[in-house]
Amino acid sequence: YKMGNSPKNTLEVIFCPWFNSCSLNSNEKIKQAQSLIEKYKTAWNVLASQLPESHAMASSLLQPKYRIVDESEEITYGDLDNVYIEYLNLCTQYAGMDKKRWKTLIEHLDRYSIDLQKDFFNKLIKKTQSMCDNDKEYLKTKIRYIVYRHRFYNQSDWAMEEDKLMIYENTISAISFNNPIFDYRYLFIKHNMPLLHPIPYK
């Protein structure tokens, strides 16, 4: 079973952007996060788990009773945004050619500004130029489903604005296959074809 005080769980609490349970301020968290991801491959998963909407709960670390400890600093909205941005930048930088890592980042991208989304997708497009068609299809299909879902439920509170969705759609067009057959394989997905312009749900 999963241990609540495992090293991974402890690191997730320490690097949680919106809950400060240690004496590190936001800038120090970012600095330590960079050092961690440079040294350990598994650190990527720790930081990715702290991206917006991916971590719903956090608990404080136990503090020693035999000595005085530094008090944790209050987190401002500016601090929170800065940490989220730097975590995304670090995870993007170290995503490499791993399609599953890129997929994870795509799933959390809607919480970021348009400019950050554009920057992210430009990096993704450049990275896919060295990917095989199967990996490109994997990522393009994921993006397609996001566009489909938000346009199908466009009246929902959580639906993305059309200007953001256009960034996703343009990314799909910009990722090209070596074999043109891959451009049409999404049409044969069973049960739920991810059309870019579905008839909205009413």
What role is predicted for each listed range?
Residues 1-202:
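Non-catalytic all-alpha helical scaffold/repeat segments
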